Structure formats: structure tokens, C-alpha cells
From Swiss-Prot:
Highest taxon, organism lineage: Eukaryota
Residue numbers annotated as active site: D151
Organism, as annotated: Drosophila pseudoobscura pseudoobscura (Fruit fly)
Taxonomic lineage from the root: Eukaryota, Metazoa, Ecdysozoa, Arthropoda, Hexapoda
One GO location term (cellular component): nucleus
Record function comment: Catalyzes the formation of N(7)-methylguanine at position 46 (m7G46) in tRNA.
Name of the protein this chain belongs to: tRNA (guanine-N(7)-)-methyltransferase
């Protein structure tokens, strides 16, 4: 990607220091309307997904195990790839420029670590997870799902757009294996209470107690691995964590 200034000065989107794409060339609105009729290419069924186009080194016996829903700029997705090199993780993001950034970031990381095999286990899809999740994953495929700092949709009329609701929780339960985990983190207490209430009311989930949640090796990474989480830490904001097990 290349940007031309008013003085016809050409600026590449890649940092000469880090070799990674720079977010300022991929700016977009903080949120996107998930109900709007965006144009997406999506498979008719999970068997039709060409995973090798996203993971060139994937083995025939491997499949996506972790899904970061609304992955943003990919900070936590990259962390997942480093923490679990044997697992295949996917980030799903609805915003086009943001997903472009994540794809370019992964490409740059793979090039920087060429020969090591690092970051071959992560990828990003631009899609609407609120509509097309079962088109990508078969029943009981996923081990872990992450919903980190989702759009709170503060207005009551827009609560139906929240990514955690009763109808969608049933879809998540469909693609999540028994014993699988759903990780949620937000800096908005009202949204946290909404999430806990809806998941507690759903018969296919139970919340992990505080001790079990805090001893999960992923938990410390939830706070500031993502760009949103890091911003909350910088601003000395609150974090509200809840982890649920698929029954």
C-alpha cells in the first residue's frame, strides 16, 4: 500500500525500522454496523474454505482451533500465534482497512522470521462473524473463542447489535467443542454485566470461577496484548474479565 501526499511525496506504509506496517495508513472508524449489508465473499459450507490460501504451511490434519472475533489490529492474534505455535488461530474482522492491516502485518512477520516457521499459524479473514460463522467452522471445531473489547453499542436501540446475545450464543455453542472456552474482556462495566447475564442464562455455558480464570495461562495476555487493551492500560481504565466453558 502506498500513500501520496499533496506534495506528491510517496510514503510507504511499512516502517523502515521495524519492517512492519504502520497503522496510520490504515485508519478507519472505530466500529462498523454489523447489520448493514456489507459485501462479503463467504463459503457455502466449512468444507469449501480454502484454508491453504491463508496458511500456506498448514498440514492436512490441521484445522483452525482458536478464533479471535473482532480481532482489530491483530495484537492479540499475534500473541496467540506465539503462545501456541502448534495451534491454528484465525482473526475475524469486519472493517476492511483494519483487516488489510492485519494481513499485511502477518505477511511482514512471516518474512522477518523466514526459515523459522513462525507466524505461519495465524491469519485474518474479513467477514461478519455475526452472520457467517457456521459457514467457516464445522460443529464442535473450535477450542477457544475470544471477544475482546467488543463494540458496546451504548444506545438501548442498538443493544441487538451486540455480539453477545442469546441467538448468537447458540451459534457459538455450535462451532465450539464441549469443554471449549469463551473469553470475554471489556472496559465497559454495563457491557460486562450484559455478557455475564446472557451467558449465565444460556444452558450451554458455565462461568469459570475466579481462581480457574486467573490461573489460565492466557488470562494475563488478555489485558494488554491487543491494541484496545493496551490503550485501556495507558488510560488507567478498568478491565472486566469473564471466561465461560461450553457444556
Amino acid at each position: 500500500m502506498v500513500t501520496t501526499t499533496a506534495e506528491n511525496e510517496v510514503l510507504t506504509s511499512t516502517s523502515a525500522v521495524t519492517g512492519l506496517p504502520q497503522k496510520r495508513y490504515y485508519r478507519q472508524r472505530a466500529h462498523s454496523n454489523p447489520i448493514a449489508d456489507h459485501c462479503f465473499d463467504y463459503p457455502a459450507r466449512p468444507e469449501d474454505v480454502d484454508w491453504r490460501s491463508l496458511y500456506p504451511s498448514i498440514r492436512a490434519d490441521q484445522e483452525v482451533s482458536f478464533a479471535d472475533i473482532g480481532c482489530g489490529y491483530g495484537g492479540f492474534l499475534v500473541t496467540l500465534g506465539e503462545l501456541f505455535p502448534e495451534k491454528i488461530s484465525i482473526g475475524m474482522e469486519i472493517r476492511v482497512k483494519v483487516s488489510d492491516y492485519v494481513l499485511d502485518r502477518i505477511t511482514a512477520l512471516r518474512q522477518k522470521s523466514s526459515g523459522t516457521g513462525a507466524y505461519q499459524n495465524i491469519a485474518c479473514l474479513r467477514t461478519n462473524a455475526m452472520k457467517y460463522l457456521p459457514n467457516y467452522f464445522r460443529k464442535g471445531q473450535l477450542e477457544k473463542m475470544f471477544f475482546l473489547y467488543p463494540d458496546p453499542h451504548f444506545k438501548r436501540a442498538k443493544h441487538k447489535w451486540r455480539i453477545i446475545n442469546q441467538a448468537l450464543l447458540s451459534e457459538y455453542a455450535y462451532v465450539l467443542r464441549k469443554g471449549g472456552l469463551v473469553y470475554t474482556m471489556t472496559d465497559v462495566e454495563d457491557l460486562h454485566n450484559w455478557i455475564v447475564t446472557h451467558m449465565d442464562e444460556h444452558p450451554l455455558y458455565e462461568r469459570l470461577d475466579e481462581e480457574e480464570a486467573n490461573t489460565d495461562p492466557i488470562t494475563p495476555k488478555l489485558y494488554q496484548s491487543s491494541e484496545e487493551g493496551a490503550k485501556v492500560v495507558r488510560n488507567k481504565g478498568d478491565h472486566f474479565l469473564a471466561i465461560f466453558r461450553r457444556l
